[in-house]
Amino acid sequence: MFGVLNSSDHRAAVQQRNIPAFGRTSFELWTDSPTSNHRCETGGNGRDSGQNRVRRPMNAFMVWSRDHRRRVALENPQMQNSEISKQLGYQWKMLTEAEKWPFFEEAQRLQAMHREKYPDYKYRPRRKALPQKSDKLLPAASSSTLCRQVLVDEKWYPFTYRDSCSRAAHPRMEDHLSSSQPVNIANSLLQQEHHYCSTSLRDSPETLAMHLSADPPF
């Protein structure tokens, strides 16, 4: 049922397949490949597989650089496509208006043919992908004032504290709220908050000096 492939024929076929295409530049190899042609027709990433993407008509620079790009690629096989584009852009700027005029006329002719062939064509540039937003929340400022409510005997009492004192006052608040205390616990919590704030200020001499300078004189 299956034919036997001779080992010498198989070896010759493999060697012929692996022979590089000498004399052809990287630019010609790129444009001759079917994937590159499909990439050009679909706009760069091959997404429009269902319907062909209509290419834009060439402008004057593209008409001029069509032949010059091939010439530069043949003279410099190792040069990358981006470097060739930079060199062609520099050469195009050095041309005079009289030298550029024939290419402008050719570009206008191609644009007129394009309008006749695709009367409903509209250029739709691809939108750049937006960067993903980070889910991390920004840290709050150290001087921001946070407001909480204290539940005491089924009544809510507003309780305000600053970030510098929250680490010391908040655990004590939870301890007191977990046990059943009379209604005047809110006053004791406020006193404890003032005590912890003054303790934290006493630990740092610089902060204490700033605090004393901010107090009004008696």
Swiss-Prot record:
InterPro entries: HMG_box_dom, HMG_box_dom_sf, SRY, SRY-related_HMG-box_TF-like. GO terms for cellular component: cytoplasm; nuclear speck; nucleus. Its main location: nucleus. GO terms for molecular function: calmodulin binding; DNA-binding transcription activator activity, RNA polymerase II-specific; RNA polymerase II cis-regulatory region sequence-specific DNA binding. SMART domains: HMG. It is found in: Nucleus speckle; Cytoplasm; Nucleus. Residues 54-122 bind DNA. Residues 33-53 are annotated as: Disordered. Pfam families: HMG_box. GO terms for biological process: cell differentiation; male sex determination; sex differentiation. Keywords: Activator, Calmodulin-binding, Cytoplasm, Differentiation, DNA-binding, Nucleus, Sexual differentiation, Transcription, Transcription regulation. Belongs to the SRY family. Interacts with CALM, EP300, HDAC3, KPNB1, ZNF208 isoform KRAB-O, PARP1, SLC9A3R2 and WT1. The interaction with EP300 modulates its DNA-binding activity. The interaction with KPNB1 is sensitive to dissociation by Ran in the GTP-bound form. Interaction with PARP1 impaired its DNA-binding activity. Transcriptional regulator that controls a genetic switch in male development. It is necessary and sufficient for initiating male sex determination by directing the development of supporting cell precursors (pre-Sertoli cells) as Sertoli rather than granulosa cells. Involved in different aspects of gene regulation including promoter activation or repression. Binds to the DNA consensus sequence 5'-[AT]AACAA[AT]-3'. SRY HMG box recognizes DNA by partial intercalation in the minor groove and promotes DNA bending. Also involved in pre-mRNA splicing. This is Sex-determining region Y protein. The gene is SRY.
